[in-house]
Amino acid sequence: MSSPGIDGDPKPPCLPRNGLVKLPGQPNGLGAASITKGTPAAKNRPCQPPPPPTLPPPSLATPLSRVALAGGPCPPASGPASGPVSGPPVERPPLATDEKILNGLFWYFSACEKCILAQVCKAWRRVLYQPKFWAGLTPVLHAKELYNVLPGGEKEFVNLQGFAARGFEGFCLVGVSDLDICEFIDNYSLSKKGVKAMSLKRSTITDAGLEVMLEQMQGVVRLELSGCNDFTEAGLWSSLSARITSLSVSDCINVADDAIAAISQLLPNLAELSLQAYHVTDTALAYFTARQGHSTHTLRLLSCWEITNHGVVNVVHSLPNLTSLSLSGCSKVTDDGVELVAENLRKLRSLDLSWCPRITDMALEYVACDLHRLEELVLDRCVRITDTGLSYLSTMSSLRSLYLRWCCQVQDFGLKHLLAMRNLRLLSLAGCPLLTTTGLSGLVQLQELEELELTNCPGATPELFKYFSQHLPRCLVIE
């Protein structure tokens, strides 16, 4: 894991995205564990963290020393004395170490800034290492960051006690092997019961490694496998546990129809399934049964090129309680498939039809007529959608988020239909080439709009953005 330079200047802060954040390393003064499985960590060794930069507040003539920052006595100010000083030095009130104040203050900093602030002093670290400041964040650890190289060239596993103190319940491991995963399990004290979510990306985990991981880490209920090409469908059959409620598999070349059979039979409590596999066919979707029908509420079939309307039939009959469905990139699905969805999945709140080139305005008529609870609709790259389709959507009072990125046939007349959608909070028109400045300016009538995306829109001029800033002051306009 990366850490600030020895000169004290931190690297540029990294921003959380989708719950994932790259955390800098923590010089917490603790020894590192041996690479040998099961070997206890070395005894704690005192380690002095690098001194933080001392920046004087505007109201102070001289910068505070580290002692003062930690609540100790302030040194006298330099310069000519104004008079004789009698008695002991006045002690600064320990505001900088008041835990009540710090507990409120630290909420205003990003995750990466908190990592740096935790190095200021023990009092700050004690406050910052409370799990509440790290809830919802997932540390990302690359394989090379899991080991320290000793002077003799040997490697030892890094100390993960700082992560345990902050109570992280999920990890994303990138480029790891079976051995790396075993070392992680042996050296992270919360791995057996405390870790709820594991994500493995671009890793060489095998069937055996997957089985050991899920057998040892009994707390894992959310699993993501992305770009892992060394495990097979047999590995899923031998390792999947009924406790898993969320599973995501993408870019894993050995995943095909039999993987869905394993998922449907072994995961009766599955609530969320995300699958991106080029070789999955309609046959796989027939494996879903009533067992998943009661529990599964989210299904994402991403770029499953072989799935047709026949596969959609299997989905709508087996999973009637879906509230979120994505058919993004399922290029063989047509308007008839969307009609099946609209007629049978009346509980849907989110529907993603992006990158479905066969979808036309007729599909939007089905959506508008039957999906009265729908709050989010994604139509990115649906190149056959026209202004007529938008006229159907304008009747949907429940819709709050509408994505029309790169819908190249949408024109100003279609935007006029959207002006009737008073509950709309998010609208994306990125890449729509036929929209003019005049047509876009009418969007100021949507006073409840919170986010408007206009990237790569020829009609989005600097004058238009200025106009929006004046008439849509509460809306984030993405240029």
UniProtKB/Swiss-Prot annotation:
SMART domains: LRR_CC. Residues 94-139 form the F-box domain. CDD domains: F-box_FBXL16 (cd22127). The modification Omega-N-methylarginine is found at residue 92. It comes from Mus musculus. Residues 1-92 are annotated as: Disordered. Residues 47-60 have a biased composition (Pro residues). LRR repeats lie at residues 321-342, 347-369, 373-394, 398-419, 423-444, 446-470. Substrate-recognition component of the SCF (SKP1-CUL1-F-box protein)-type E3 ubiquitin ligase complex. Pfam families: LRR_6 (PF13516). GO terms for cellular component: cytoplasm. Interacts with SKP1 and CUL1. Keywords: Leucine-rich repeat, Methylation, Repeat, Ubl conjugation pathway. This is F-box/LRR-repeat protein 16. Gene3D superfamilies: Ribonuclease Inhibitor (3.80.10.10).
